[in-house]
Amino acid sequence: MNAIIIAAGSGKRISNNVKNMPKSLVKINDKTIIEYQLEVLKQVGVEDVFVITGPNSEKFQLNNVKYIKDQNYSKHDILGSLMEAKEFLKNDVLVFYSDIIFELKIIQQILKSKNDIVIAVDMNWEKMYEGRTEHTALEAEN
């Protein structure tokens, strides 16, 4: 099993404190978001991890991953960036956004499924947008 992590966004909505830094490289408790992801992927036996990068790709210095640079990231949406790795979508593969922290049990539940396609959804996602004046629920799919 392989994993593809989409990290080609420009982080337009991120805090000024970490501008020009990919969101996945923001540290939380001394570890980057993508390092949390890689730990979980290792625990479930993922063999190869492909990280699709865009702007600031030179800031990624992760070991044991293969990089795919989306040369057209400014013209692509998330699906366009994912298509840069289409040759790796042929077999069993996990696909993630690079700025989401998830628990091991979520990936274990996905892997137990017998379905061809499985999508993990936070059913309480709307609570994250309550009271916001910036980055409203209308932007949730972006």
Summary of predicted features, one role per range:
Residues 1-5, 13, 27, 31-95:
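Conserved N-terminal catalytic core of the sugar/cofactor nucleotidyltransferase
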Residues 8:
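The conserved beta1-alpha1 loop
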Residues 63, 104-142:
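Conserved core of the sugar-phosphate nucleotidyltransferase
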Residues 98-101:
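The conserved acidic donor/metal-binding loop of glycosyltransferases
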